[in-house]
Each structure stands twice: as C-alpha cells, then as structure tokens.
C-alpha cells in the first residue's frame, strides 16, 4: 500500500460524525459482547470453572504489563496537532515495537513468580505462550489510531468484530476437541494476529516504517509520562480485585467471580467503549469552556450516554440471579449473587465516567494521573481491608466506596477544564 493513502477529513458536520460514530460504536459493542457472551456460555459447558479462574490470572498479568508500560500513544495521536504527520506516526510506531518486545520478555520472566505465588504450575507454560500476542501487536499499524482520531469507525469496528469472531470459532473448536484451557490461549493469540493482519490490509493510512524523530519522541514522552502512571493506576482500578481475590479464593471461585463481573460490568464497559472513541475528539473540537453552545452540546452527549448506561444497569442489578440461572448450568449458580453485588457497586462510576477525558483532550495528563492514582490507592487499601474479612462482598464494597469517595476529585478535575456538569451529576445521582 502506498504511503499516500490517508483518511479524508470529510465534509460531514461534527454532529453527524458524533451520531454516526456513536451508532457504529454501539452496534460494534453490542455485536462484540454478543459474541463474547455466546463464547462464554459455550466454553462454560466445554470447560470447568477453574479454567476461567486460571485464565483470569493470565489475563491480569497480560493486561498489567500493557497498562504499566502505556505511554499514551493512542490518546497522543488522537489529541496532538501532529497526529496526521508521518514522522510523528512512525516514531510512535517504533516506540510501540520496542515496548512490545520488552513486554514479552517481562511476561516470560514473571511466569515463575506468578506460578509460585498462586500455586498454579500451569502458569509456567500458559503465560509465555499467551505473551506471543504482545509480539504480534508490536507491528500493529498506527492506521487504527488515525481512524479513531477522525472518528472513521465503520471499518475499524468490522476489523475488531472479524478478528473476534474468527478467534472465538478457533477457541470453541479447540475446546470441544481438547477440553483444555489451552484453547483459550490459542484463541487469544489468533485474535491478535488476525486483527493486525486486517488492519494492514483494510485500513487507509501511511505504511509505517521505523523512525526516530527527536521532536516526536519529546512530545510523546512529555504527554505520556503521566499517562504511564495513570494507566498503571487504571490497572489497579480494574484488576486489583482479581489479584487480591486470587490469593484468597480457589481457581473455581475466581472463575465464578470473573463470570459475574463480566455480566455486571457490561453497561460500564459499553460506556468506556463509547467514551474512549468519542469524547477526546468531542472535547478537542468543541472545548466546553469556550462557549455555552459547546457546553450544551457536551451536556446532551453526556446525558445520553449516562442515561443509556443507567437504563442497562438497573435491570442487571434487579435480575442478576435470574440471568445467571437462565444462561448457565448449576455449576455457575453462585455467580448470580456476584452479579447483583457488583452491579450495585459499579453504579457510582456513571457520575464521572467522561470527566477524565476532558483532561486528556486538554493535554492535562498530570491531572488525569492524580485522579486515577487516588482512586487506585484507595481501592487497594479498601480491598486489602475488606476481602480477608468478607471475601467477594468485600471486593464489591471496596469498588462502590472508592468511586463514591472520589467523585469530588473527578468533579474538580472536570471543573478545571470547564466540563463539570452539576445538573448531570444531580440527576444521575438522584436516580
């Protein structure tokens, strides 16, 4: 492909791009999670609950390595004035390759400590093979970030769905044939390979080549040093429950918790998907502090997102036990109570879910870090206090309290960038 293939700016209005991007993201998220739920249900019948527990630990390590080394390449490309400059993009791609190779080596080195700490010898083999996906993602093109920058999301969503569907099909065939947790590992590696191949073949944009431009490195590092710390904090926010519970629960118990978390967290995950794709471009092109019209536009988008998440969360909260009984066999019945507890605990997140994106769009990655760092530190402390006493219920309590207690900090950060909406918070908090 020629280097001259680029994504056109287009003449569609910004509102039309928001509407189209929202519709595509929602459709993609719905289909993706339908595939994920279907595969989860089928795998639950082909494998045993402890398989989901041990893969939760593998996933925690893979996610942790990626998040603890994230210097914010994607949000930097989305928000930078040089986000379409080939030298900037190629430098970002080169940094990504170096990082991925280092992550693979770290994953291999951490396999033995993980196996020893959780007393699971299988992790010695499962972790290094799973880490092959990190090497594959090293050559993922920046075309993905360019498509996201310009909210050209249709083809990007199709690539993600195709890679997920094909890898799940492979996973299910292998699980049926072997009854082994290795089926999940093979599917995850295949997913990375398919996504990278399709991105190179199907997305417009430059053909990335190794490049090291000092100015680009300086901008990426300056922006990314706080993103690095913020994503490390985000890892603790999203994965510390599994790390801590994995020490106190059996692998079967951890697997049941993981299934419950997936069902309870669906609306929040959908919100993150929409916000991650839409909010930085919205803040960048329509800064809410610049005019009442921009603020009103942002309020409409935020109200729609929060209302949608709330409408999905309430039925999950009320019907979690029934949902698990409907979808899973008797071995997984305990997940129903987990769904209810976690759905209640996750509700406070809706209040401030989009506020931190205002900081990123303004280049305030430091403020973004302090918010996430405070949340993470508080969550870990509450988890360590509550989980040994009451187990899974303690984890749910810690999650809920963390987001309630940190709401003033999120509101303060949003206010600094003209994005705080007390009307939104009062309405959603009242509900």
State where each predicted segment sits.
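Interfacial segments at transmembrane-helix termini and the short loops linking adjacent helices
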Residues: 10, 52, 112-130, 317-347
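Transmembrane helical elements of multi-pass membrane transporters/channels
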Residues: 21-37, 163, 167, 184-199, ...
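Alpha-helical transmembrane segments of polytopic membrane transporters and translocases
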Residues: 42, 50-69, 133, 193, ...
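Helix-loop junctions and terminal segments of transmembrane helices
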Residues: 68-84, 148-149, 260, 264-301, ...
């Amino acid at each position: 492909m020629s280097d001259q293939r680029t994504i056109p700016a287009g003449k569609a209005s910004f509102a039309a791009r928001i509407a189209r991007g929202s519709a595509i993201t929602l459709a993609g998220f719905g289909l993706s999670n339908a595939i994920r739920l279907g595969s989860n249900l089928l795998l639950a019948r082909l494998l045993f609950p402890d398989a989901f527990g041990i893969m939760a630990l593998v996933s925690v390590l893979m996610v942790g390595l990626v998040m603890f080394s994230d210097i914010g390449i994607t949000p930097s490309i989305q928000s930078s004035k040089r986000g379409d400059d080939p030298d900037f993009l190629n430098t970002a791609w080169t940094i990504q390759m170096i990082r991925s190779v280092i992550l693979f080596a770290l994953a291999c080195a951490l396999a033995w400590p993980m196996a020893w700490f959780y007393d699971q010898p299988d992790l010695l083999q499962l972790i290094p093979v799973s880490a092959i996906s990190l090497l594959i993602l090293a050559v993922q093109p920046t075309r993905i970030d360019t498509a996201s920058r310009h909210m050209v999301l249709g083809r990007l969503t199709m690539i993600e769905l195709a890679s997920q569907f094909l890898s799940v099909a492979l996973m299910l065939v292998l699980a049926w044939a072997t009854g082994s947790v290795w089926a999940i590992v093979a599917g995850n590696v295949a997913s990375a390979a398919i996504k990278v191949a399709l991105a190179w073949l199907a997305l417009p944009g430059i053909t990335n080549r190794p490049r090291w431009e000092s100015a680009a490195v300086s901008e990426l590092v300056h922006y990314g040093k706080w993103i690095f710390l913020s994503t490390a904090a985000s890892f603790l926010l999203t994965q510390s429950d599994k790390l801590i519970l994995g020490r106190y629960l059996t692998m079967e118990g951890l697997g049941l918790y993981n299934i419950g978390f997936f069902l309870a967290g669906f609306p929040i995950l959908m919100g993150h998907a929409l916000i991650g794709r839409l909010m930085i471009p919205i803040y960048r092109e329509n800064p809410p502090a610049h005019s009442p019209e921009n603020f009103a536009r942002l309020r409409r988008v935020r109200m729609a997102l929060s209302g949608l998440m709330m409408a999905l969360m309430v039925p999950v909260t009320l019907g979690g036990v029934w949902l698990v009984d409907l979808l899973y066999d008797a071995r997984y019945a305990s997940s129903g109570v987990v769904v209810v507890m976690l759905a209640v605990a996750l509700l406070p997140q809706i209040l401030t879910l989009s506020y931190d994106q205002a900081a990123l769009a303004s280049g305030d990655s430091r403020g973004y870090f302090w918010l996430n760092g405070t949340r993470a530190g508080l969550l870990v402390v509450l988890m360590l206090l509550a989980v040994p006493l009451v187990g899974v219920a303690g984890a749910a309590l810690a999650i809920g309290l963390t987001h309630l207690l940190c709401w003033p900090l999120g509101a303060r950060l949003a206010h600094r960038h003209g994005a705080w909406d007390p009307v939104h918070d009062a309405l959603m908090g009242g509900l």
